[in-house]
Amino acid sequence: MEFDLGEYFRAAFEDKLLVKMPDREDDFMTPATRLLEKRREMVEVEQALSTQKEEFQMKSESLQQRRSELELKEEKLKDSLFKFDKFLKENDSKRKRALHKAAEERQMAAQKERDALRLQAENTQLMQRKHILLQRQEKNSIYQRYLQRVLERTDEFQEVQEMIDRFNTLMATQNKLLKRELKNQEHAEMEKARLLHYQEETRSQILELNNQIAQLQGELERARAVAFQWESRWAQIQNTAAENTLRLGRVRMATLNLFQTISKQMRLKTDISVEDTEAQLEKIQICFEDLAAIHKDLKKAEMVPQTPAVPTTN
């Protein structure tokens, strides 16, 4: 609940600060008594103002401490965002290198696949050729002679068994390439899934940090609004204190004028200082009490009936 300083002073001192018309039963209150009453009221107002100043100072210090804490949190959050952005950039560089490496591996796998297809085609041809040769060998030994002639015409193979060994080597190479390709594909799929998961986590963290920034900014704006309200109230307190000080000065001036007038009319010789308002009020009160006593005696004298004259007998 916000503290309304104006309503507080209005409720606490409305009856004291407003100038009231005296009631009929206060017709006989002396001006000195009224001045003393006003002075007591001014002391109460000054005490209340002093209390409010202390409360305001304490709340101002609390708000300043809260503002410092919010600014420190904001600096820490900015530093975290800077480090996190650096982390993202580093991981983005790693991701690009991984993608480049995966692309190179895919190209190599594609090249190896083409080589495998080529070797497979060659292998198929060799198998067909072997089968034909076996059939022909079974049917006629002419094929053996044919192979011998082929071996004689080429420098690549020296014996028929070398051709068979070459075929087995090509088959083993093909199987090895197929296994490597399958492994590379599985690795690429795993890296892709890991990258997608990392991107989702990164987006969630960025969203959470943005929400925290928005919340801290809202708290900072509210703290600034509260500080502005208290600054306005402090200005109002200072204005009220200035008005009360001016009013007190007027009361002291009126007291001094009344004291000087009474001293002059009654020809009193006193050594009371012009700054000693309390002593002046006491002197004024004594004079008014004396005048009231004289007035009362005069009233009594007027009310005593006069004794009629006794006639003398001649």
From Swiss-Prot:
**Family per record:** Belongs to the CFAP73 family.
Species source reads Xenopus laevis (African clawed frog)
Q: Which InterPro entries match?
A: CFAP_domain-containing (IPR051147), DUF4200 (IPR025252)
Q: Does the keyword Coiled coil apply?
A: yes
The Gene Ontology CC terms held by the record are: cytoskeleton
Lineage of the species this protein comes from: Eukaryota, Metazoa, Chordata, Craniata, Vertebrata
Q: Which Pfam families match?
A: DUF4200 (PF13863)
- The protein in question is named Coiled-coil domain-containing protein 42 like-2
Provide the alphabetized UniProt keywords. Coiled coil
Q: Does the keyword Coiled coil apply?
A: yes
What start-end ranges are recorded for coiled-coil regions in this protein? 34-139, 175-233
